[in-house]
Amino acid sequence: MNEVILSGLGILLALCGMTVLIFRRVSPIIVGPLAALLVTVMSGLPVLDSVTGVYVAGVGSFFVSYFMIFLLGNILGSLYQISGAAAKIGETVVRWFGAKNCMVACLISAALLSYGGINSFVIIFAIYPIALKLFEEADLPTYLLPGIVCGGMWTFAMTGPFSPQICNIVSMQSLGTPSYAGLIPGLAASVVMAVLIVWYMNRQAKKAKGRGEHFTPPEGGVRQHEGPTPGTVVSFIPLTAVIVLFNVTEIGIVACLLIGIVLSLGLFWRSIPWGEMLSTMNQAAGSSVTVIINTATIVGFGAVAKITPFYAWAVELLEASTANPYVVA
């Protein structure tokens, strides 16, 4: 039992350590192996075999399984960014809601792009100019901007029913569930998340105005899309195709993203600055590797945690439990 307690303590310390170090901007590529090493030592596992074998295998398995999704999602997002299609979607949402509903407009703009399969790290750059303009019209401090944009793309849009994002895809492949698993609870939770995010951000905006804070333009300004942009309907077509194909057919997310890319190239060809295409694709490829490696190094820690005495004890305890399966899960 002592080894189980030590193992559990090691996992807890590793999780806390990862949280603190990552918030202090230490690279996950460094944090992941260190956390795995700590758990290995405190669990009494063979250090060399666990770190160079189990950990590296966990990292490699995640990379091999999901690299194409990250790459194609980045390319699709980059096409939306350089063509101005992402900005067009943002402008359309702004027209629907106006500056008075700044937080709602920013949230929905980010969520729409996320539900279209675009990588979240691309969405930030695509939405930023539109969100900044909204914040200027609403006279809100810009430090609130990342919160509402991330709230739109990293919460319900990443985990909700029908989402083609990596969180949903991993669940589908690991558990064999459809994209709409837990449809009613998932939709209800998504609505609750969206409402609470908007409520909280509006509350913070009201407090900021009460303190006399105002919009301050960023140094150096923001690069705006120059040249013609696709029409509103045309801008929505590739994203809609990805969502529909992902949920209605069985061709897989990689094929869906490829179709989205082909549609984007065909529909946005007049708006794409072809002289920038090579550098854009190189940047998309490079950033996709960075993102997936950062994620995979943390996933590798989970592979090591699975072979610890504490994990085996916890699984046995939960499997023998008579509690509600949802609570146990």
What do the PLM-derived regions correspond to, one by one?
Residues 1-6, 23-25, 52-64, 177-186, ...:
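Interfacial loop-to-helix junctions that mark the boundaries of transmembrane helices
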Residues 2-10, 17-50, 72-84, 242-275, ...:
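Structural signal for alpha-helical transmembrane segments and their membrane-water exit/capping regions
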Residues 2-11, 15, 184-280:
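Long, contiguous bundles of hydrophobic transmembrane helices that form the permeation core
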Residues 8-12, 30-33, 67, 100-108, ...:
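Hydrophobic alpha-helical transmembrane segments
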Residues 18-25, 77, 110-118, 152-158, ...:
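Transmembrane alpha-helix interface/packing and boundary motifs in multi-pass membrane proteins
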Residues 30, 115-131, 144-145, 160-167:
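Transmembrane helix boundary and interhelical junction motifs in multipass membrane proteins
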Residues 48-137, 274-329:
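Membrane-embedded alpha-helical segments and adjacent helix-loop junctions characteristic
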Residues 133-229:
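Membrane-core helix-loop-helix motifs of multi-pass transport proteins
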